[in-house]
């Protein structure tokens, strides 16, 4: 049974996130910049050269959203802003971890149709915002968990193909939209961003196809004779390996992403006020503009840099709380010291190896 505190934690994160982000967008002038750009007779991307592509699917509301999306994502992936590119790198480490964990959770029922909710939740995160949907997903996930579902593991075939689903559905579309300008035109990059936006659907689709292909391969005789306990043991070992590999990849991305920040902090990148490296200083990189500050952003790039950090922090706070509530110590009433010590330790791990590493590591501990 889920702790009663989840009824406070996740609604609070959701409402606080909505309040902070909406005030940030208004007070910083970012929302007005959006309005002015779209109202232009010939809307341009933040580089002020590339025309905004406004038709993608032929569905006006969806096309309008995808066009608005370009103002935040294009400067993150086109290499025009060092700080945004580095933030995008950190986002990749987080997305790999979070969506791997979400995919595993959807596969516990062993019903292919449960990949539909995974895809829908993922698309909701992409279209409505990580900071809004992730707290709601975590809340619903904890409310809907049952002891029987906790004990179930995905099939061996499903576990084996998860890396392919992440690679083909998420990593490859991400890499394509980040190709240099001499390989990808401004218009093509906008199409690539629109394709990437739907990566949860591509992950689910690859998972279904790959599992069906793996299932068509005849099992070895030794596997056919495996008992139920033996199958559980094999699947748990495979899931542990998946979690460990995902945690290592996420941690590696985070640690590599810290190198420019540390270099800026110790003066290796000469981060003077007018230098392009100025935003890589730890305080400038990690701390966005406060939501109630009326300092106007200088352009769409700065606005995107602020928004994407709020999005990252708020959604990840929910994911962090989610996996903490799954831990055995949370099921022991009055075990406040153990909970506090666990949270402190995991905050330290997050600073060193990134939130993706911590989230996946905690989900692995849940198997104990």
Where are these regions (language model features)?
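Long, hydrophobic alpha-helical transmembrane bundles and adjoining juxtamembrane helices/loops
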Residues: 1-368
């Amino acid at each position: 049974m889920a702790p009663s505190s989840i009824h406070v934690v996740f609604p609070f994160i959701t409402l606080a996130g909505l309040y902070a982000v909406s005030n940030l967008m208004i007070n910083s002038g970012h929302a007005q910049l959006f309005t002015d750009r779209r109202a232009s007779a010939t809307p341009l991307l933040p580089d002020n050269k590339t025309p905004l592509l406004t038709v993608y699917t032929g569905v006006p509301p969806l096309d309008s959203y995808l066009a608005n999306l370009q103002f935040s994502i294009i400067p993150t992936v086109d290499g025009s802003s060092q700080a945004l590119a580095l933030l995008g790198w950190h986002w990749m480490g987080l997305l790999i971890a979070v969506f791997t964990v979400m995919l595993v959770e959807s596969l516990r029922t062993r019903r292919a149709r449960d990949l539909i909710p995974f895809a829908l939740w993922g698309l909701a995160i992409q279209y409505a915002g990580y900071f809004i949907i992730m707290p709601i997903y975590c809340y619903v996930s904890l409310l809907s968990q049952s002891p029987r579902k906790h004990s179930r593991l995905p099939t061996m075939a499903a576990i084996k193909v998860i890396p392919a689903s992440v690679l083909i559905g998420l990593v490859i579309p991400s890499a394509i939209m980040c190709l240099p300008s001499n390989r990808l035109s401004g218009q093509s990059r906008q199409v690539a961003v629109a394709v990437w936006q739907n990566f949860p659907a591509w992950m689910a689709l690859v998972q279904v196809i790959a599992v069906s292909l793996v299932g068509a391969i005849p099992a070895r005789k030794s596997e056919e004779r495996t008992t139920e306990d033996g199958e559980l043991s094999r699947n748990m070992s495979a899931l542990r390996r998946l979690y460990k590999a995902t945690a290592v990849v996420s941690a590696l991305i985070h640690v590599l992403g810290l190198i420019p920040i540390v270099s800026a902090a110790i003066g290796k990148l000469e981060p003077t006020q007018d230098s392009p490296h100025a935003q890589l200083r730890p305080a400038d990189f990690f701390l966005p503009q406060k939501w109630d500050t009326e300092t106007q952003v200088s352009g769409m790039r700065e606005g995107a840099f602020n928004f994407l950090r709020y999005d990252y922090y708020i959604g990840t706070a929910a994911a962090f709380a989610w996996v903490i509530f799954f831990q055995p110590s949370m099921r022991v009433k009055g075990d406040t010291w153990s909970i506090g010590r666990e949270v402190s330790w995991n905050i330290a791990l997050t600073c060193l190896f990134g939130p993706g590493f911590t989230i996946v590591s905690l989900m692995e501990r849940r198997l104990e």
